[in-house]
Amino acid sequence: MSRVRMDLFTSIDGFTPADQTPDNPMGEDWSRLTAAYTATRTFREKIFGDTSGRGTTGVDDRYGAAFFDGIGAEIMGAGMFGLHAHPTDSDWTGWWGPNPPFHTPVYVLTHSAPRPSIAMEGGTTFHFRDAAIDDVLREARDAAGGLDVRIGGGYGTARAALDAGLVDDLHLMIAPVFLGRGHRLWDDLSGFDTTHTVTSEVAESGVIHVTLTR
């Protein structure tokens, strides 16, 4: 059976950003958490289409490459798609551009569903669902064709999946920064170390990669 995967960025004091706006959908603190990842060769190639070979290699790049492997479907929240930027515009196709980096079916959790599905370049099709995350996960598994399902952000979607015990493989990228504000990822959520095997590795950038595998 396909596995449910999640990759999360967090600060060393356990925060994820909570300052998103329509003009800055990831929040001001997002770039501080993701600086090492966005500098990698894999990110530059997969997200920006840069095939020059520029970008960092090493531990961060190895985890970055694994991020894209074996994914057959994605689940994300409305904020990660960008619905909050143009909530009433039925022609809005999200802020990922004409060729999003997913290349799979993507299920967007939103209370504004039903909305028509949107087929993009490169194989990405956005489907909009107003349903519990475990129900949408069943649909995503069917669409994944035996490959894994990744649950993306934002914070609310990630916490819903963690609270429901849906995540088989969790990869935490802990940036060596203190935010002092935002969403506290682990409040009232415990026991992952008893249900998942925990490993950690420190990258050259100082980012701590923690993996929890069921």
Residue ranges and their predicted role:
Residues 1-214:
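Enzymes that bind and transform nitrogen-containing heteroaromatic metabolites
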